[in-house]
Amino acid sequence: MNPEYDYLFKLLLIGDSGVGKSCLLLRFADDTYTESYISTIGVDFKIRTIELDGKTIKLQIWDTAGQERFRTVTSSYYRGAHGIIVVYDVTDQESYANVKQWLQEIDRYASENVNKLLVGNKSDLTTKKVVDNTTAKEFADSLGVPFLETSAKNATNVEQAFMTMAAEIKKRMGPGAASGGERPNLKIDSTPVKSASGGCC
């Protein structure tokens, strides 16, 4: 068993371009935020280790490009993901409407029992909000998927989103699931593709 951690979970952030995926990752992994927006090119990732129920869990979080032209690059990262976080922008109705399309991508490329989490980001922009919390919650409930509204800018629910995902995966793995080093299905077999760092908006 690897002494550094008990579990290694690979998470994937997906959603339309500009919804704040990179911002959520920066806030969770580095506790930083930037107003500038630089589009993620292809795929980027960060690692953060957390403690959950007395276990050390290493989270490898992959941030994907939302643009159509990168879909072929990013689709390969669905395989082997333990959890996928679908992000939309609460001030952008189209990004919410496209959640269904992203869920289809998960069905097409990810493993059958992958954990999912729906996140409505930019909750701090209350006056510009167009996607109703209740509507999104009901949609998530109909899929049996946890739902949270977050703000990468003021750190609202960001920690909770990733911790919820880690807890759901750990629950699915069950007490018999071994460490990242022992079980092949917990090993990360993707070759890291380092990209230009994604900015935020």
Curated annotation (Swiss-Prot):
Membrane disposition: Lipid-anchor
Other remarks in the entry: Rab-1B binds GTP and GDP and possesses intrinsic GTPase activity.
Cofactor(s) listed: Mg(2+)
Cellular compartments annotated: Cytoplasm; Membrane; Preautophagosomal structure membrane; Cytoplasm, Perinuclear region
Chain positions found as N-acetylmethionine: 1
Signal sequence, start to end: none
EC number(s) per entry: 3.6.5.2
Notes on how activity is controlled: Regulated by guanine nucleotide exchange factors (GEFs) which promote the exchange of bound GDP for free GTP. Regulated by GTPase activating proteins (GAPs) including TBC1D20 which increases the GTP hydrolysis activity. Inhibited by GDP dissociation inhibitors (GDIs).
Sorted UniProt keywords: Acetylation, Autophagy, Cytoplasm, GTP-binding, Hydrolase, Lipoprotein, Magnesium, Membrane, Metal-binding, Methylation, Nucleotide-binding, Phosphoprotein, Prenylation, Protein transport, Transport
GO molecular function: G protein activity; GTP binding; GTPase activity
Lineage: Eukaryota, Metazoa, Chordata, Craniata, Vertebrata
Sites of S-geranylgeranyl cysteine lipidation: 200-201
Positions contributing to Mg(2+) binding: 22, 40, 63
Protein name, as recorded: Ras-related protein Rab-1B
